[in-house]
Amino acid sequence: MITNDLGIYIHIPFCVRKCPYCGFLSAPPESESQIGLYVDALVREIGMAGSAYGPGRQADTVFVGGGTPSVLEPGQIQKIFGALRDSFTITGDPEITIEANPGTLTKEKLKAFRDCGINRLSMGVQSLDDDILARLGRIHRKRDVFSCYKMARDAGFENINLDLMFGLAGQSRKIWEKTLDEALALEPEHLSFYSLQIEEGTPFYDLYKAGRLDEASDEEERRMHHMAISAAEAAGLVHYEISNSAKSGRQCRHNLKYWSMEEYLGLGLGAHSYLRRVDLSEDACEEEKGADEFNRAEEKSAADAAGYSDITGCRGIRYNNEEDMAGYLGSIARGALPVDGKSAAADTEKDAMGIYVFTALRKRSGVDLEDFRRCFGKGFFQAFPQAEAHVARWQEQGLAEIITDTGSSVPGPAETKEEKSRSSSPAETKEGGYFRLTEKGIDKSNDIMSEFV
């Protein structure tokens, strides 16, 4: 169910050393002073964004990502969160996450995190095999993970995620199984497990193009993925999204916003935003940064919103901040939000429906058919008439299912004219229901999800 509460993402683009597989907007600082200059600019952006977006809105999740946010000093983190609380209304029970590299954590930093209200720690472990960590270019080793995990528990963190990677060169199933066993023995509340993605522009991509990068086969990656799901389940973590498992009530609320088409505001270098209500002053985006494009997208989104009594049902606008550090700092120095107006685009109805389904199918709960109807004013199979045959085939193959709210399975798309005119699915004609992938269907998720975008 889409809610009105905002998610806030804060980007810290610095790291100690760029990993050779990393395609994110991050790099080691160019000088000792650059981090301080960036934090000062970020604090100013938070204040400007609070004036532009904050009135009347409240945020229930905050996610500080990177890069490696834990490279910041305690005073810098405190400055950022002081500005955040001065500029935005944070709900009484927020989820506030910070990403951390075990090689950069100290007791002092962890205490500062807790003092700032950060209540969720996401540790970039990746592997618990030192040889693999070295190949990945990571600055930490296995012993650092265990010592930092203990420090985090001692500091009062009761919600910890461990990030792991599979499909890596030299990573046998035995090594992966050992990593899973040792990670889960720590009893984290959340486990993320991602296959290695070869990103263009990275050293790993160059090795791949030159035929010098060992890769796991697709079949091997599938086996490793299911190993993670099974191991996590045995440890009491429920598989709730393709690459994530969590204890009950510990699903990542912020990331669920991305997978549920809820609004999020990105702050910092290159940060992305998705908002349904955007009404910025004319100087919010500088002319040379694409103010005309941004204003057109804003007007289109506003016109669409006027047709909806329920704001959560309307389509939104997507854009990102300036990705060049000099450009980002320059915009803020001139008193303008660092928005890259040329990136702004208002969703069409087709875009919005496709993204809704694509992201919802990442979740094990799948597409909430009642919520889809509420958002778009039409049933799922009315919106995607071509999907009827696909869904029937996927059901026959055991790749997908339609279930009612009570958990009972529905054979397939409705066949009667009356049902088709209303919603085209028995699950939609009753008290709601869900269209979701089965565990087997997750292996074909990319093929299935691509049918809707």
Predicted regions and their residues:
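Ser/Thr/Pro-rich low-complexity tandem-repeat tracts
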Residues: S408-G412, S421-S424
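Short, amphipathic alpha-helical interaction segments positioned at domain boundaries
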Residues: E439-V453
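A short, conserved structural fragment
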Residues: R393-G407, E428
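Short amphipathic alpha-helical interaction segments
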Residues: F380-Q395
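Short, low-complexity intrinsically disordered segments enriched in A/P/G/S/L with frequent Arg
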Residues: A306, A414, S425-A427
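Minor-groove-contacting beta-hairpin "wing" of winged helix-turn-helix DNA-binding domains
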Residues: G432-T438
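C-terminal scaffold of the Radical SAM
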Residues: I2-L6, F24-S51, Q58-F381
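Local cysteine-cluster metal-coordination motifs and their immediate loop/turn environment
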Residues: P13-S26
